[in-house]
Amino acid sequence: VLGGENAYLDPQAVRRETTLISSVVQRFHDVPFLAWDLINEPSFSKHLWQMRPNGDAFERAAWNRWLDARYPDRALLADAWNMPFIGPGATLPVPEEAEFQLRGMYTGPNSLRLYDFFEFAQDTFAGWVKNLRASIRATGSQQLITIGQDEGGFDDRLSPAFFGPYVDFTTNHSWWQNDALLWDSLVAKQPGIPMMIQETGLQREMTLDQIARRTPENDAALLERKEALSFVEGSGAIQWLWNANDYMTSGNEVPIGALRADATEKPEATVLRDMAHFAGEIHESLRNPEPADVAIVTSQAAQFSAIREMQIAAQRNAVRAAAYVAKMPVSVIAANQVGKMGTPKLAILPSAQALADSTWDALLAYVKLGGNLLITGPVERDAHWHRVNRAAAVGLDGATVEPLTIHNAEMKVKDETISLSFGFDAQTWLDTFQFKDGQQLKELAAGNGHIFWAPYPVELAEGEAAAAKLYSAVFSEIGLSAPFELKSAPAPGVLIYPTVLRDSVLYVMVSERDQDYDLELVDNTSKGELKLRLPAEHAAMALIRKSDGSITAKYGF
């Protein structure tokens, strides 16, 4: 819109952007309750909603400057990329399309440049955000600043794990990943920064003959689950948009909104009205949330690679296994944020396969200070997928890395045998450990803490049962129990997620099953009791006062 070859790197484009934003902010810098969203659902380039090079001269020059700063010795760069040495001053091209594909190495160059390109893109965008923030603050504005990112920002696009220091709150737009809505909230939250589900709602899903798949009641139930889960690690949600969207030209976006074109209400309107009432009752208590006892650590080395979708699958399965099945609240920490992780009672590194040295060092520092770390599968590759010897370095002798080539496996954890099944992708791309004394969970002392190491990439086995059993065993070993006592029988597909606040405990309860569930529990913090019928596919919430265990606000029952 403002011209230029590259929105983030062309000096003329950046100058115009800065002038536009400064001019608008100057006019409205004292308006209360106004926030600045610098860009909506950003991609790094002209290739919308994917991470690909733009291919312009500004990008190429910036890419080479970034490489020179990261790798002053070109020999180290050649080694990292498995390429012939290219002397100083020579221009290095950005990655080709084939390098982003799973089997690109069969037809073109390897994909080892991807990790650096992803980091370059993240650093470049973070710098752009930093500069615009400075321009806004120069006007005297103290209004909140954010970036409205969608779920792709937690896959392979621009991530608040990098630009987070330059915004006042992070966001996610929970549109499509309806089976990973808890993950949506957890990955958007960055250490020390508030998070909001800034856009949520229902886009139309149709059958092959162009009939809407969901009924209005289905839509309302899904919206209810999305709104409820926005209170996990977050400060709520905004439905985009709350009224009607009839002037959109996109067929799947026209139906968005709680009102129809004739201004009659959909069932979603009742959800919004009731949610607003509940939020008004609890807002004074939504302060000083205690961090979860368990932190799931991502691998950006794997996520910024050609097999990135497998790392995303591992994260989502880890979240579901821990929170839904093992009933343990968790947080998710990006690899480059591990230094800000704090002191959870357990950190889980799920099926990473590869990991940057800096992340590994930060995890070991956490363990040596008394932390517990669970690792599943080998992590014997660095950020460029070169072999390293991390297991031996921490005392795990006799562990050999082998390609995972089997469908079925068994792993012994104390007196229990955990069965695992691996599909085609796992058999094609993953490594596993062979321990010299059998396939069992290893426990290693490191400083004041402990490392638990499982031989298989458990989170990339089919289903979440294997990971949940492993997690439960480790929880028991370190004396970690769920923050509530469940009196009713556990039910698959039901999430019970408590957050301990300054004066209360907030319970978010979500059903993703086909039958109602009679839920009964005792909260360990307040000794308060919850007893309700959770309808199939719906959500409920309750705020329990710490001092006497009474329910001071509730939704859905």
Predicted regions, residues:
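Short, well-ordered secondary-structure micro-motifs within conserved domains or adaptor modules
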Residues: 171, 342-353
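Polysaccharide-binding and catalytic clefts of secreted carbohydrate-active enzymes
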Residues: 2-23, 27-166, 182-184
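A conserved amphipathic helix/loop scaffold
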Residues: 219, 350-557
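A short, well-structured beta->alpha microelement
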Residues: 150-159, 320-341
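Soluble or luminal CAZymes and related metallo-dependent hydrolases
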Residues: 9-20, 59, 69, 117-128, ...
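Loop/turn elements at helix/coil->beta-strand transitions in domains of secreted/extracellular proteins
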Residues: 29-35, 72-73, 140-144, 167-168, ...
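Short beta-alpha junction loops
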Residues: 42, 201, 243-246, 378-383
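Hydrophobic targeting/anchoring helices
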Residues: 148, 154-318, 405-417, 430, ...
